[in-house]
UniProtKB/Swiss-Prot annotation:
Pfam families: LcnG-beta. The keyword Membrane does not apply. Coiled coil: none annotated. Keywords: Antibiotic, Antimicrobial, Bacteriocin. Kills Lactococci. Bacteriocin activity requires interaction of alpha and beta peptides in a molar ratio of 7:1 or 8:1 respectively. This is Bacteriocin lactococcin-G subunit beta. One of its GO terms (biological process) is defense response to bacterium. It comes from the Bacteria.
Length: 35
């Protein structure tokens, strides 16, 4: 299937975008020091 890869890539991209927005919302909280 030509677009078969989009079945994984598109949701993953949306997840990463959402995670990025969440990280920005959290700002510089100390939890990031624990990574």
């Amino acid at each position: 299937k030509k677009w078969g890869w989009l079945a994984w890539v598109d949701p993953a991209y949306e997840f990463i975008k959402g995670f990025g927005k969440g990280a920005i919302k959290e700002g510089n909280k100390d939890k990031w020091k624990n990574i």
